[in-house]
Amino acid sequence: MNTKELWIEVKEILSRDESVSPEIYNYYISDTNLYTVSDNNCLITTKSEIAIGVFEAGLNEKIKNILKKLTGIQYNISFELEKNINKQASVISKIDTLTENNNLAYYENYTFENFVRGDSNHEAMQAALAVALDLGKKWNPLFIYGDSGLGKTHLLHAIENKVNEIYKTNNRVKYLKADEFGKIAMDILNQGHEIIEAFKTSYDIYDCLLIDDIQLLAKRNKTNELFFHIFNSYIEKNKQIVITSDKYPDDLGGFEARIISRFSYGLSIGLDSPDFETALKILEQKLKHQNNLGLFSEESLEFIALNFNSDVRKLEGAIKRLLFLAVMNKKPNEIITLADVEKAFKNAPLQNNEKITPKKIKQIVADSYNITIKAMMSKSRVSNVMQARQLAMYFCRTLLDEPFTRIGTEFGGKDHTTVMNSVKKVEAHISTNKEFKHLVNAIRRKIEGR
C-alpha cells in the first residue's frame, strides 16, 4: 500500500466514525493529504491553520490508532500548511536542478568495496562506513579532511550508495558540493523571507547530508548563516552530517569560531597520501577495472607507485600518459617495461629524486618547530626541543629504517635505549593526540617532497 492509498483508507475510516461529524470531515479532513512517511514519522498537509488546530485538539490520537491498525507501526504525526509545502517543494526542485549532475551513474562505482584501503585511509574509511550503517548515531558530524585526490569524494558517495542499498531508496541522502550550495544560497538570499525560511527546512526530507569541500564556503557570511541553521537542525534531530575539507577544522580560515567549534563537535579524521603499498594496490585495481593490468610489468607499476603517490589523481595521470605512449609507440599487447616508464618520465619532477637523509630530516623537523639543528642536537630538556629531537629520531627510524644504534650516533652519541624510547613516545603520542598526528603527517610530506 503506497502513501496515497494508505491515506485514502484512513480518510474512509474517519468518514465512517460516528465521533467525527460530517461537518468536521467535509471542512477539515477531506482535502488533507499524507505528504511523507519516513521511519516512524508522518507529515500531513492541510489547507488552513484552523484545520491543524482541529487535528491537534481531537483527531491526532485517533489517526495514530488507525495508522497502527493498518500498518502495525506507531507513527508520530505532524502537520503543515499545504502552501508552505508548495514553497518548500519549489526550493527542493531548484536544489535538485542545480545538483542533478551529482547523481550520475559515474558515482555508483564509488563504494566501500571499491575503496582501496591502507594505513593512510583506513580510519577514515571505517568511520564513514560506521555512520552509513547507523545514521546519526555514531559520529555526528563526521569531518573528513585531507589534500585533493586522496578519496574524500569517494567516501561521501560510498556513504550515499551504502545508505541507498540498505534502505532501497534514493531519497534519504543528499550529496552537495559546497560551491553548489553557495550558488543555491545566493539565489535564495535574493528572494523574500518566506522563500528563505522554506529553504532552511528544505533539507528536512533527508536523513543524511553530505557536503564536499566545505572550505569553498569560507568568507561567505550570509551563506554560512544559512548553512549553520541547517547544520544545527540536523544535529538536533540526530540526522547525519558528513563534511569534507582540505584542512583540519581548526586550520580553516574564513569561518566564525562557533561554526569551527560545531565542525569539531563530532569526529574529525584525516586522509594522508597513500604509502607505496596502497598506491600499488590502487594502480592494480584501476588497471584491472580497465582490463589493462596485463600491459604493465611489475617493475613499471612499482616505479609509478613510488614516484607518483602523493595523490590518486597523479597516479591516474601517470597511467594515462603511459597508455597513450604505448598506443603511439608499441605493438598491441606489448608490455610496458621499467625502461619505458623511466624514458617517459625522464624530464618529470619525480617525488623520490631527492634522497632522504638524516640531515634533511633534522633540518625540516627543526624548521617546523622553529628551532636550530644545534638546539636539537644539544642536551636541552625544553619541551619543544625534546619533542623535535624525538620526532627526528622517529623519522630516521620509520623513513630510513636505520638501526637504533646508528640513529643514536647521528644524534650526538645517544644510546640504543634512548632512541628506542624516543620512537615509542612519538608513536604513543600519535595514537592518542589527533593534532600531533596531523602535525607529524604534515612534516612527513615535507620530508618526502610531497
Swiss-Prot record:
Q: Which coarse location class applies to the principal site listed for this UniProt protein? A: cytoplasm
Q: Which region ranges are annotated with the description Domain III, AAA+ region?
A: 105-326
Question: Which residue ranges does the record annotate as region Domain I, interacts with DnaA modulators?
Answer: 1-73
Q: Name one GO cellular component term.
A: plasma membrane
Q: Which portions of the sequence form the region Domain IV, binds dsDNA?
A: 327-450
Quote the Pfam families the UniProt record gives. Bac_DnaA (PF00308), Bac_DnaA_C (PF08299)
What pairs make up the disulfide bonds? none
Residues reported in the UniProt entry to bind ATP: 149, 151-153
Which GO BP terms apply? DNA replication initiation; regulation of DNA replication
Q: Which UniProt keywords apply?
A: ATP-binding, Cytoplasm, DNA replication, DNA-binding, Lipid-binding, Nucleotide-binding
- CDD domains xref list: AAA, Bac_DnaA_C
Q: Where is this region: Domain II?
A: 73-104
The record's subcellular location field reads: Cytoplasm
GO MF annotation list:
ATP binding; ATP hydrolysis activity; DNA replication origin binding; lipid binding
Q: Does the keyword Lipid metabolism apply?
A: no
HAMAP family given in the database record:
DnaA_bact (MF_00377)
Q: Which proteins does it associate with, and in what oligomeric form?
A: Oligomerizes as a right-handed, spiral filament on DNA at oriC.
- Domain notes, please? Domain I is involved in oligomerization and binding regulators, domain II is flexibile and of varying length in different bacteria, domain III forms the AAA+ region, while domain IV binds dsDNA.
Q: What exactly does this protein do?
A: Plays an essential role in the initiation and regulation of chromosomal replication. ATP-DnaA binds to the origin of replication (oriC) to initiate formation of the DNA replication initiation complex once per cell cycle. Binds the DnaA box (a 9 base pair repeat at the origin) and separates the double-stranded (ds)DNA. Forms a right-handed helical filament on oriC DNA; dsDNA binds to the exterior of the filament while single-stranded (ss)DNA is stabiized in the filament's interior.
The text of the family note is: Belongs to the DnaA family.
For this entry, the protein name equals Chromosomal replication initiator protein DnaA
Annotated organism of origin: Spiroplasma citri
